[in-house]
């Protein structure tokens, strides 16, 4: 096996976590920019109706892509565990089983998106003037879903062994292509929402091709060999046991957010458009923080597999500190630069004013989510996924739905709607931390030497 294992199991943790997380954060940002460039281009060159149409799909896009990201988190943890423990055969079986599972998941989600887009958008109470464009955007965008699934698979494998630079490089190429195609399809071809969706789908295919090609050229046990593609029952079960709860958590979050989107849609079209523009900040800030969550799971899993309990707990606290700091700093920057940020997506002053109502509530709340999400990642790094998912479903998702139908229904204001985010994050974080403390104590018991007789 390669000496690259030392990237995660040796050396100063604070420095190593930062160096691994930085390319991950940039990769996450580029993925967000895929959709942001769609919104910016249609808002600038296709009008506010097209902007609202694309923005109305954001929750559904998050639902499906969130499931794939959760699945890839399971792949990341399992490969890291076996790689840290120096079990090359298990790494090989996991990689090839994961490739098959990811491809199948991408195709299934593609079919669901193509067939179910109209019904799901109507369920969200999407405005009638926005509905045709939103349906077109979703159906074309989902053509790239299998490619997105395979890219996330490749990203998870490389990240699990500490190589986060390759995914960043490939996504940079695809991101530049995405922006160029957006401008070409919308300005030159006048394709509006179809053009930006097509640009995203093509770019996702390019990033998937590049990362899969790189995996086939690796000289290590995590290499992808098309001739070895076979579903190993034991590894497939482990991947699904880790990845499906994480994927369902992301999907359930998105489902809960559907109710929030329905609440936004209960206001006039101006507020819907302002919310669509302001919501782009969520992806930028949250995904920068999420890089440290993936690093946390990778470092904890590899060090746990390598028998380094001293580094396991430190990985959690360092990752938590980084993610909280990033959320706080970026949230403050958004608050003070909000109008300029919103102007990237619309030139209408009224839409910018509407968007600032959301920004004023959310800007200083992002950092709170680090205590919830980093703790969930830490539990997954120890192989625990079911209970953290149940806690999230109850503490955040169910709580949010109840909030929408009680607190928001009573006050019916934008602040009353968006205050549910920090409140649900605090509630869930407390429960997740209590569970992690318990399972950490049990997991570390295997490293304690028995007392002398």
Walk through the language-model features, giving the residues of each:
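Transmembrane helical elements of multi-pass membrane transporters/channels
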Residues: 19-38, 140, 151, 174, ...
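Short alpha-helical transmembrane segments in multi-pass integral membrane proteins
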Residues: 1-21, 79-146, 188-244, 300-365, ...
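Short runs within selected transmembrane alpha-helices of multi-pass transporters and secretion channels
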Residues: 72, 141-159, 167-175, 196-211, ...
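N-terminal transmembrane alpha-helices
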Residues: 8-45, 59-74, 78, 103-110, ...
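Small-residue-rich hydrophobic transmembrane alpha-helices
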Residues: 51-111, 148-167, 261, 274-338, ...
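Small-residue hotspots at the loop-to-helix junctions and early N-terminal turns
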Residues: 46-59, 134, 138, 197, ...
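Helix-terminus/linker motif at the lipid-water interface of multi-pass membrane proteins
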Residues: 33-52, 121-128, 184-191, 251-284, ...
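Hydrophobic transmembrane alpha-helices of multi-pass small-molecule transporters
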Residues: 63-66, 178-182, 208-212, 284-287, ...
């Amino acid at each position: 096996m390669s000496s690259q294992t030392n990237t995660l199991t040796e050396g100063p943790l604070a420095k190593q976590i930062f160096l691994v997380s930085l390319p991950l954060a940039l990769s996450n940002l580029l993925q967000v920019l895929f959709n942001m460039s769609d919104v910016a281009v249609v808002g600038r060159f296709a009008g506010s109706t097209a902007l609202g149409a694309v923005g109305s799909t954001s929750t559904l896009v998050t639902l499906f892509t969130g499931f794939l990201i959760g699945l890839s988190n399971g792949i990341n943890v399992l490969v890291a565990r076996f790689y840290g423990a120096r079990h090359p055969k298990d790494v090989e079986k996991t990689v090839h089983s994961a490739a098959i599972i990811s491809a199948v998941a991408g195709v299934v989600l593609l079919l669901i998106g193509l067939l179910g887009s109209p019904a799901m958008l109507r369920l969200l109470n999407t405005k009638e003037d926005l509905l045709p464009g939103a349906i077109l955007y979703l159906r074309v965008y989902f053509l790239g879903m299998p490619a997105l699934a395979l890219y996330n698979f490749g990203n998870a494998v490389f990240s699990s062994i500490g190589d986060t630079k390759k995914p960043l490089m490939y996504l940079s190429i695809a991101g530049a292509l995405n922006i160029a195609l957006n401008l070409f399809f919308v300005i030159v071809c006048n394709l509006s929402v179809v053009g930006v969706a097509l640009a995203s789908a093509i770019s996702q295919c390019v990033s998937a091709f590049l990362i899969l090609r790189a995996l086939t050229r690796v000289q290590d046990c995590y290499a992808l060999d098309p001739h070895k593609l076979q579903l190993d029952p034991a590894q497939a079960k482990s991947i699904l046991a880790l990845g499906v709860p994480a994927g369902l958590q992301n999907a359930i979050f998105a489902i809960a957010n559907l109710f929030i989107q329905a609440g936004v849609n209960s206001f006039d079209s101006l507020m819907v458009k302002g919310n669509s523009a302001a919501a782009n900040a969520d992806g930028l800030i949250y995904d920068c923080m999420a890089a440290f969550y993936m690093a946390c799971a990778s470092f904890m899993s590899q060090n746990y597999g390598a028998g380094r309990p001293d580094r396991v707990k430190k990985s959690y606290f360092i990752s938590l500190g980084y993610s909280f700091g990033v959320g706080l700093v970026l949230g403050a920057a958004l608050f003070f630069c909000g109008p300029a940020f919103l102007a990237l997506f619309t030139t209408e002053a009224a839409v910018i004013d509407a968007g600032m109502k959301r920004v004023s509530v959310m800007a200083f709340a992002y950092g709170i989510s680090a205590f919830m999400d980093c703790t969930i990642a830490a539990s997954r790094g120890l192989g625990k996924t079911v209970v953290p998912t149940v806690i999230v479903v109850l503490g955040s998702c169910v709580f949010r739905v109840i909030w929408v139908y009680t607190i928001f229904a009573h006050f019916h204001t934008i602040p009353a709607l968006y205050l549910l985010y920090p409140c649900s994050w605090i509630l869930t974080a407390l429960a997740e931390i209590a569970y992690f403390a318990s399972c950490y104590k049990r997991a570390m018991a295997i490293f304690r030497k028995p007392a002398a007789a």
